[in-house]
Amino acid sequence: MPTGPELAKLIETLQFAKDQKTFHKLRFFRPYMKQQEFMNAGAHFRERLLIAANQVGKSYTGAAETAMHLTGEYPVDWIGRQWTRPIKAWAAGESGQVVRDVSQKLLCGEPGVDTMLGTGMIPKDAFVERPSLARGVTAAYDTVQVKHLAPDGRSVDGISVLRFKSYEQGRAKFQGETSTWRGATRSRRWMSTPKSSRVSRRPAAWCSPPSPR
């Protein structure tokens, strides 16, 4: 039988493992072959489109890659698109509610539950502060600030900014502001489009306009 100190150490270790799986999902992301092919293509193509059936991991894949770019945390064998500096990103969808229930949930955690912040693909300790709320949709986020790790993987070299947008806001909401990485969901597709794309009628997308690696 373990002694008191040994038992305490075991409990501490198990709690740490549980917290890692709960609040650091990105570190446990292991893509399937097709998901990996889609992400690898980012190293060579400005536009990417992923079409598949419902509930097979399209949005999950997009959220994982977006979290990598926001945080600077890439797998050691990563060969897709990569930024060595903080980025400005968009995550968009057909409506504010859809964006909240899909993109926001996968990236940040269950909407409307404070204790669930950090249970999405963005690690809990990567949030600079609690995200600001959007207008018109309960528990929907507008802007998220994320700590970006330097290439050494240890120090923070800046803050990435993620903004949630919806097509129902109109074209004007997508004009003027610059972004490094753009993503959107629509129907059963994921698609990446260049900076000048028309967003109001596009199918789903995670997009990376031209930018130095």
Q: What do the PLM-derived regions correspond to, one by one?
A:
Residues M1-R213:
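Phosphate/NTP-binding elements of NTP-utilizing enzymes
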